[in-house]
Structures are given as structure tokens and as C-alpha cells.
């Protein structure tokens, strides 16, 4: 089995590429980073440091790479069985054009084999978004063939992969936590679900998408925003602060109650899931910088993202949400001169005040009780 994977960064190599390779899938990475592509082509392997209760180094083999702006990647799409991505939500619309060119050439070559495409991104229904972008670049005459032969499979992915350590001179080595979760919507495949160890299938993907978004993502960013306020440098430092740990756990319990009401998750099992995530944040082998997790606050404050979406759920079900509100207030306190979104957010705050800024970026009514509570909390945070 062959796969083309867009994005040879840490998540691509340390998570999706490794899972595929471990199941004997021949992986071709596609990326714009020329030195990275050249090194992958030369070595055709790389090391992954897997850290949990212990540390082990695995070697991923039988991989290669092409430049994602070249004709090579289009030719690879013609003959591949699977396309996956880990490029970041903002890059999907860029690679969609390349995928559309590859599909066009595939159809022109009369390749009738089914092809499945899976976007492995930190966004809800990311592959559906990618599909819409691909179809916008695909000639109308090919839409019916695409509907018949190409599966656009939504997924939920979860693995903490921090940036590589600066002291490491191995361009390809990547560090990942031992925990990983890759869940796919089995209803969207064409030609059956491939047998890939580490890729779990479900017929109720949204339950798992929101479980991850409302727990891992919500807890992670609140840890970062509260940690930034207290001067912590890493997620581990922040979550070992007893006050922050208590508040992060409470926020995940508030969002967790939404999940329990909405999807019927078992209360005790979900409590154990929260504890597991708190343990992951405290992993001594991971140096996960606060600024990596806190960056792009505007995206994270979107109404369908990790702070506002669970808050809206608490409003829907009449659930306590005071700690989620504090996490949202802390996000508006985040200052980082090297992050354009953080700069934009602080500029808007200075020019328009909190309530107007809150309404502008989150969609919350500035006269709502939640907005008033967030404003009250905001004024108490230093």
C-alpha cells in the first residue's frame, strides 16, 4: 500500500507517517521545506523518540519525499492508495489545488482504483473542508468520478508533538509522547477501510472529535493561558502549579459534563480520561513551550473552537461554566509580540475594549451574562 502525506513536519513524521510506516505502508512525504525533503530522500528513514513513563527510540524506514510544489507530487497522487495531511488548517486550501491536479491526472489516466484522503488536522471535519476546497479547483466534469472513487474521510487526531530540541543536530529526529489517538469516520471510505494499526474506526466521529476538542485542546490552552499569566515557561511547569492544575481540571470537568449529556459518555470513564490528560501535560520528557500552545489566540477563540464551543454547550445544558469563563478571560490577557494574532487581539482590546473585542472574535453577545462575567474576571487577572 502506498500513501502520499502532505506535511513532513514534526506531526507528519512523528505521528501519521510513523503510524503508516509501522503498518508497512510506503510513505512519500510532500513538503515545501527543501532541506527536509532532501534529507528524507537521502536517508529514507528517521528516528522517533517516544516518551511516556520511559523513553525509547524507534526508527521509521522505507520513506521518501517530494517537494509539494513540484510535478512529482501530482504524479504520486495518480498512483497512490491514500493521501493524508498534517499541514495545519490554514494550509489546506493551498494543497487543495495540488490534490485537485493530481486527481485530474489520475482520472485522465483512467485509474479506477478507490483513493481515500484523510486530513489529520486540529479542526472539526477538516477533511470535509478540504473536500470543498478540492472540488472548487476540480473541473465540473470530474465531480461525478470523484464522488464515486474518492473518499474524503474526516478524522480526530491526538498526540502531543513539541518542536524539536534546538541542541539536536539531527534534522529528522522528532520527539512524541507515547499516547496517540487517530480515529476515522468509517462511513466515508471508498473501497473499504484499510487495515492500519493505530488508526481506529468509528461510526460516530463527532463524539470523539468533541471529546478531544473539549478535553485535550480546552485543557491544553487554558493551561497555557493561565501559565503565561504566572510566568511559567512550559506546560509541565504550569500544570505542576497546584492552583492552575485545579482550575484546568475544573474547566475540563465543565466541558466534560457537556459531552456526557450530549453523547452519553460514561461519567467515571470520562473522569479517568481527564486524569490521563493531566498526566500527559506533566510528562517530564516533553518540553512543551507555553507559547507554542497559546499561540494563535484568535483562532482558538473562534465559536467552533476549544474555548467557545464548550462554553456554548454549558449554556445549552445549563451547566456550571465559571472556570471555562476564566480560561477565556485569560486568553484575552495573552501577550506575545512574535505572534501576529496575539498582537492583533491586544490592539483590538486597546482600541475597542473587552466586550466589543469579545463579541468580534467569539460571536458572543457583548450584553450577555457570559460576556459580563468574562469582563469581571478579566479585570481581576494580572
From Swiss-Prot:
Work out whether the entry's keyword set contains NAD.
yes
Q: Which residues cross the membrane?
A: none
Name the top EC class.
oxidoreductase
Query: What domain of life does the UniProt record list for this protein's source?
Result: Bacteria
Instruction: List GO terms (cellular component aspect).
Output: cytosol
Q: Does the keyword Oxidoreductase apply?
A: yes
One example of the protein's molecular function in GO is: mannitol-1-phosphate 5-dehydrogenase activity
- UniProt entry keywords in alphabetical sequence: NAD, Oxidoreductase
Q: Quick one: a GO biological-process term for this protein?
A: mannitol catabolic process
Q: Which reaction does it catalyse?
A: D-mannitol 1-phosphate + NAD(+) = beta-D-fructose 6-phosphate + NADH + H(+)
What are the binding positions for NAD(+) in this chain?
Answer: 3-14
Q: What is its EC number?
A: 1.1.1.17
Instruction: List each coiled-coil range.
Output: none
What is stated as this protein's family in its record? Answer: Belongs to the mannitol dehydrogenase family.
HAMAP family annotated for this entry? Mannitol_dehydrog
Protein name from the UniProt record: Mannitol-1-phosphate 5-dehydrogenase
Q: Identify the species of origin.
A: Aliivibrio salmonicida (strain LFI1238)
Amino acid at each position: 500500500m502506498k500513501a502520499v502525506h502532505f506535511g513532513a513536519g514534526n506531526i507528519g513524521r512523528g505521528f501519521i507517517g510513523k503510524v503508516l510506516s509501522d503498518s508497512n505502508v510506503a510513505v512519500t512525504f510532500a513538503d515545501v521545506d527543501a532541506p527536509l525533503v532532501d534529507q528524507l530522500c537521502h536517508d529514507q528513514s528517521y528516528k522517533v523518540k517516544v516518551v511516556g513513563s520511559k523513553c525509547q527510540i524507534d526508527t521509521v524506514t522505507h520513506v521518501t519525499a517530494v517537494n509539494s510544489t513540484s510535478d512529482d507530487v501530482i504524479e504520486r497522487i495518480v498512483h497512490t492508495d491514500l493521501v493524508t495531511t498534517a499541514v495545519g488548517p490554514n494550509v489546506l486550501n493551498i494543497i487543495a489545488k495540488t490534490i485537485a491536479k493530481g486527481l485530474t491526472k489520475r482520472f485522465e489516466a483512467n485509474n479506477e482504483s478507490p483513493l481515500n484522503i484523510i486530513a489529520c488536522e486540529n479542526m472539526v471535519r477538516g477533511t470535509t473542508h478540504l473536500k470543498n476546497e478540492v472540488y472548487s479547483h476540480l473541473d465540473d466534469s470530474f465531480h461525478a468520478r470523484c464522488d464515486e472513487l474518492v473518499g474524503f474521510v474526516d478524522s480526530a487526531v491526538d498526540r502531543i508533538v513539541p518542536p524539536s530540541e534546538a541542541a539536536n543536530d539531527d534534522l529528522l529526529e522528532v520527539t512524541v509522547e507515547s499516547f496517540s489517538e487517530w480515529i476515522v469516520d468509517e462511513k466515508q471510505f471508498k473501497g473499504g477501510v484499510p487495515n492500519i494499526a493505530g488508526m481506529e474506526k468509528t461510526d460516530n466521529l463527532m463524539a470523539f472529535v468533541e471529546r478531544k476538542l473539549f478535553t485535550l485542546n480546552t485543557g491544553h490552552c487554558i493551561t497555557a493561558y493561565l501559565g503565561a499569566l504566572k510566568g511559567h515557561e512550559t506546560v509541565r511547569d504550569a500544570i505542576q502549579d497546584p492552583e492552575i492544575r485545579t482550575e484546568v481540571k475544573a474547566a475540563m470537568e465543565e466541558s466534560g459534563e457537556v459531552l456526557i449529556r450530549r453523547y452519553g459518555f460514561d461519567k467515571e470513564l470520562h473522569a479517568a480520561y481527564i486524569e490521563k490528560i493531566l498526566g500527559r501535560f506533566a510528562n517530564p520528557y516533553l518540553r512543551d513551550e507555553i507559547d507554542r500552545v497559546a499561540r494563535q489566540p484568535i483562532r482558538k477563540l473562534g465559536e467552533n473552537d476549544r474555548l467557545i464551543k464548550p462554553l456554548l454547550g454549558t449554556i445549552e445544558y445549563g451547566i456550571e461554566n465559571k472556570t471555562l469563563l476564566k480560561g477565556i478571560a485569560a486568553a484575552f490577557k495573552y501577550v506575545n509580540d512574535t505572534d501576529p494574532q496575539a498582537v492583533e487581539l491586544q490592539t483590538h482590546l486597546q482600541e475597542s475594549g473587552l466586550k466589543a473585542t469579545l463579541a468580534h472574535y467569539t460571536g458572543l453577545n457583548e450584553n450577555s451574562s457570559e460576556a459580563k462575567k468574562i469582563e469581571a474576571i478579566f479585570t481581576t487577572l494580572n
